[in-house]
Structures are given as C-alpha cells and as structure tokens.
C-alpha cells in the first residue's frame, strides 16, 4: 500500500478524534498500527487507556500512530510502529511473538484513520501476562513515567463478542468488528 503522509500536530489529531472534522480536506487521516494478542489459554487482550490519555478509559488493542522513528528513507514501517507501541503499553517484544498483519481499517465519515492490525499469539497465559503487566506498571509509577494502559482486559475468545458488549467503557470504533472477524474467522476454520 502506498500513501502520501504529511506531518500534523497533536492538537489537529485530538480535535478530529474528539470533535470530528467534516470537511474532507481538513481531516486528520492518521495511519496507525496495532496488534490484538491471544494468550495460549485463548484470551484476547485489550487495554484500558489511562485517564491522562487522549481517550480516557477507552478500550483498544495495543497500538498507536506512526512516529518519525517508524519511517526509514521515506517508507513507513508499520511493524516498527506495532513493536514500539507494544513495548510502551504492555512491555512485550514483538520479535518474541508469532504475528501477522491481517486487517486494514479504511477511513470513513466517522473515523479518519488507516489502521494496520496484526494478530499475535502469545506463549504465556492470561495470568502470566497479567502479572507481567502489573510489574511493568509498578515500574512506570516508581520511575514517574507515562502510563498508557491503566489495566489489561481479557476476553475469553469463545465468548469475546458478548463479553465486549457487556463492558461499559468507551471502545475504539474498530474494536467490535475486529473481535467479530477474529471469532467468526476461527469458527469458519473449525
């Protein structure tokens, strides 16, 4: 996929994210990369955004916008974005995860983003990941560093759609359809 990107500022992004820009030529069509993780005991992993982030308490997958560090010789390395965000938000190394970019989010009237979404399979359980995350969060607090995910949310894959719908948190617009595609896709493969 080829696209031409122009640098903007955070205020432009936040305004479009929170209020929305109707005029097509002024929209902030942000490219981003993310990964939905599945533990070895069949839980899908989401994060609840911290209260100090752009969308407080919102549920999303680990991921975020393209950063200058993700661009090499004018080429955006989406896997580098995913790697960086996964490290920042959960403190996992993408190099240790079997993953594949499988889904693309295209901008529409409501959400002005290009999302490149990977699925990653972890070799640890829900409990092991939870313990890892809690230790990481303590380290961030101790060192007065930014917390992006306040907590992890685990959805049992076989019941993920229902569990997601029961949660009262705001959710990124792509999340419900992504979970459905993953669950239904696996049902088709059974």
Ranges and model annotations:
Residues 1-61, 65-84, 91-190:
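N-terminal leader/linker segments that precede catalytic domains of diphosphate-processing enzymes
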């Amino acid at each position: 996929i080829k696209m031409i990107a122009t640098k903007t500022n955070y205020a432009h992004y936040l305004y479009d994210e929170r209020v929305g820009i109707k005029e097509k030529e002024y929209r902030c069509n942000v490219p981003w990369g993310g990964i939905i993780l599945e533990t070895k005991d069949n839980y899908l992993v989401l994060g609840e955004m911290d209260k100090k982030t752009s969308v407080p308490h919102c549920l999303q997958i680990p991921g975020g916008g393209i950063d200058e560090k993700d661009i090499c010789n004018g080429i955006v390395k989406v896997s580098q974005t995913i790697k960086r965000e996964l490290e920042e938000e959960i403190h996992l190394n993408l190099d240790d995860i079997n993953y594949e970019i499988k889904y693309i989010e295209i901008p529409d009237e409501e959400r002005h983003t290009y999302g490149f979404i990977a699925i990653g399979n972890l070799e640890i359980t829900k409990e092991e990941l939870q313990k890892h995350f809690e230790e990481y969060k303590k380290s961030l607090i101790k060192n007065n560093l930014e917390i992006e995910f306040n907590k992890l949310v685990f959805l049992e894959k076989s019941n993920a759609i229902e569990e997601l719908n029961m949660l009262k948190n705001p959710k990124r617009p792509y999340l419900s359809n992504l979970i459905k595609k993953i669950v239904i896709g696996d049902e088709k493969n059974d």
